[in-house]
Amino acid sequence: MPFLFSFDCWDVHKYEEVDTSFLDLFEHHIWMVHQNNNEFYKKVDYKDGQFLPEAYKKVVKVAEKLYKAKPLYWQKLLTDKIKLTGEVAKKVGRPLVTTECWGIVDYKDWPLLNWDWVKELCALGTVTAAQTGMWVGIATSNFCGPQFVGMWRDVKWHQEMTAIIKSAELDESITINNEIAAKLLKRL
């Protein structure tokens, strides 16, 4: 069984500063909403009462509009963090897995909520992670469970994301002369 620790720290350079040689891989959580010091959630005013109905109502009322007002800005925050995480992982020779990721952390499957903007960010995150070549395991979103009907009803989207993940080529830094990564890849 691979030895890892799940991280969602903002400063991925810590992987370079701290001895992580005992880890087989980094399981790093990355969400757009946490970038730039939680800027998105601050603008939504989603800081107190997480998991309370009032907090979710703020998300429903504000989040999609906020994203759609500056989609390229929010997308760049996400892709910059994914690329940086990939670069740092490459420097220290550790593959990446992400199991919680990409767009928004908390989104309810309430009636009539639009999932298109969430899927847009999640597709971007999935594609960007795959392109780095450093991810050996990629979740498509924070909403991979079938209880999220809003995500699961789009079978084609999931098939497209799965095809991207399965066809992603791994970087030579984890496939050639990397004993730790080779051991891990053999187990996967």
Predicted region positions:
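Aromatic-rich peripheral "rim/lid" segments of glycoside hydrolase catalytic domains that contact
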Residues: 110-188
